[in-house]
Amino acid sequence: DAPDFNFEIHKKLQKKGIKTVHVVCPSVWAWRPGRVKQFNYVDYMLCLFPFELEYCANVNKQAFCIGHPLMDKQKDFENDDKENIICIMPGSRKAEIQNNLEVMIDGFNQFNFEEKYKAIIPIYKEDDKYLIQDKIQKHKNITFANVESSEILKKAKAAVVCSGTATLEALLAEVPTTVIYKTNWFNHLVLKNLMMSEFVSIPNIIADEEIFFELLQSNATPENIAHDLNSNLADYEFRKE
């Protein structure tokens, strides 16, 4: 986290002749491409994705791909026995939960009017438990579980997740997924001007095409979430691939 702060440290250490390694390569392929100039302050860059090596090579920076840590857990996401479960992942930060969970709940309820499905929210942090519990207590088909997200995703037939690492987890679990993201207008304006891609989820950015449905800001409505859930499940095998 805080790469801008870390690069300032690299800069000071470089002046003292101390060699440094930066873990991990900033996502200059997704937003703020000008940050690539800061790579000159480090001696070695460690990357999560192979294609990031090219960005380092463009500024003559020696780099190595160490792989994304989630790949070490790939087997945790494997399971052929799917259940009538929708995995809801509203984000790992309190602001994300506040901004995204309610519309996710409403979207699931509209989709689940026949009550054939159960939604489960994996809890990342104990502190989030009470916030989530307060928001779902009146919804009988929605619950939470204090388990690794892989435990829910590998059983789910579809997922609704907040943009972030959760999208990679859903990809590993081969779960047809709708990505949503709602934030305040100021953050949205700033991010919109800094983003290089038309997409916000990592799988879509890497593929440069819509692997997962994305619903952002005003498009993240209960109606659209319900529609996407129906679409994902109606063509389950295709969306899974």
Which stretches of residues belong to each language-model region?
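Charged active-site motifs of nucleotide-sugar-dependent glycosyltransferases
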Residues: 81-87, 117-118
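Active-site and donor-binding regions of nucleotide-sugar-utilizing enzymes
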Residues: 2-78, 87-101, 110-111, 124-126, ...
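Residue-level signal for inorganic ion chemistry
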Residues: 45, 104, 225
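Donor-nucleotide binding loops and adjacent catalytic segments primarily
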Residues: 96-155
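A donor-sugar binding/catalytic signature common to diverse glycosyltransferases
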Residues: 147-194
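Short, hydrophobic alpha-helical segments
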Residues: 229, 233-237
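Short acidic-hydrophobic, aromatic-tinged amphipathic segments that line or gate anion-handling sites
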Residues: 47, 64-66, 143-147, 214-221
